[in-house]
């Protein structure tokens, strides 16, 4: 006679029988290694920087985490920056962006201008948020950016002067966008 002995069986929903929510059901991610630059004063997609996830349950949440290897706007003063928002299936209406407040735009992150040398760019910029989509249909989350002024470009995974030397500030970086389904 065969026996199967286990401490617990975790169902597809990510939560053992008798337990409450919080288990990770699935993880979907994208890794962006190419360099991106824009001077757009309207929101534009960051190319090849989106994830699609299909929740198993309407009660589950989606945790979005984004980390830019390096990103920002290089200027001599700190009065020009950039705005970042996350779209879900093409809509700004999700729990990842700010609530509507008069005529103010809805962002999840506001980047400042960095007054470093032209070849320097800060790194480790990121954000996260928990969305409550209440669906089992596919969800596509993508990141968009907008420049405050077209004179001051937003750069991602590269220094502003796009140097290719061997100095640390000229090195290539990687950015990640991660979606995790969390059991409700």
Model features per residue range: what roles?
Residues 3-36:
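Glycine-rich, low-complexity segments
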